[in-house]
Amino acid sequence: MKNKMYIVYILFFVVIGGLLGYLLIDLDVFSGKNENDNPPVANTTTDKTDNSQIGNIDVTPTTPTTPSKLTIMDENSKTRPYAIMINNYPAAMKVQAGLNDAYAVYEFPIEGGMSRSIAFFKDKTTTKIGTCRSARQYHPYYAYEHDAIYVHWGSNHPGSDAISDLKITHIDANSTGAGKNKPFYRENPAKLATEHTGYTGIDRLLTYSKSKNHRLTTDTKPPFKYSYEDVDLSSASGAIKANTITLKYSGSYSLVYEYNSSTKRYERKYNKKVHKDYFTGKVFDTKNIIIEYVKVGTVAEYKDAAGTNYLDITVAGSGKGYYITNGYAREITWTKETKKSQTVYKYLDGSEVKINDGNVYVNFFNKSKTVSIK
């Protein structure tokens, strides 16, 4: 009887052992595998734990940085530019400073047959820029299309209205004052009238902006489309030679761009004088020129100190002009759908204007006149 019981026990353990062996094999216990041999499964839960360091392995995600392909500016930069009003009265043009550091300069007609400019600076450390002058009502809209901080030394009444309408960040010397620890200062190396002695600098403007908590970054790109390759207009449809460009704003102010074939840049002259930085002696020059023919009128209800009606420019709309680079010019159209929108430049065939890598002067010129291009 006992022998029969032993046989039953043995058979029982054999059966149980077989079942356990089958299960262990099925579960890969003897296969040499482990859980890390299986493909990882994505974690579908939100885990806010900082796992940037696991053991000695750094698994911090990296964001690739793309080097800028442009030299005029870092195209990946989000630095907000400054748009600074520049005094172009002929007496003051001889003491101008800093314009060669601007990525763009816009030049507009104003009263008395003169012009006034906006110089745009981005990621620069220029300490002497000027001389600075007041705003007109059309100027702030062009600063706005760059999302720039607008810098001016006063404004006429319509200009103040435009600044209020746009709610644009601006720095006005009439409010901040000028002097030590101010965003503006005066310097008079040529013994000129006081209105021709106001300067600023990026260092001063940044210090002031930080003290006022101005937004210093932007996602807005300039309205120009830059080409990574050299723009050669010589064989383009409708292109003409452009070695000398003359804009006669009035009998008392004439502007000339002369092409330097060695540098492939245009050098500026005003009233037959070389236009240069008073403090460095460097000639103001440019790689690109854009001419915009615009409608010029007057503001009936406001006059300047001399009793002259302020000029007005029709900001929104469209018109014709020229893009000029490397010794050639080609006719273009410009379109600014609203006062607050960016200007779009196209050739007459509808294709997009791409400008050369370099600075650009944009000259707004009365459409009732003609720019001479030879």
Sequence positions of predicted segments:
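Alpha-helical transmembrane segments
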Residues: 14-22
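Hydrophobic single-pass membrane-insertion segments
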Residues: 21-36
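A surface/extracellular/periplasmic glyco- and lipid-processing/surface-interacting theme
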Residues: 2-9, 17, 34-104, 111-374
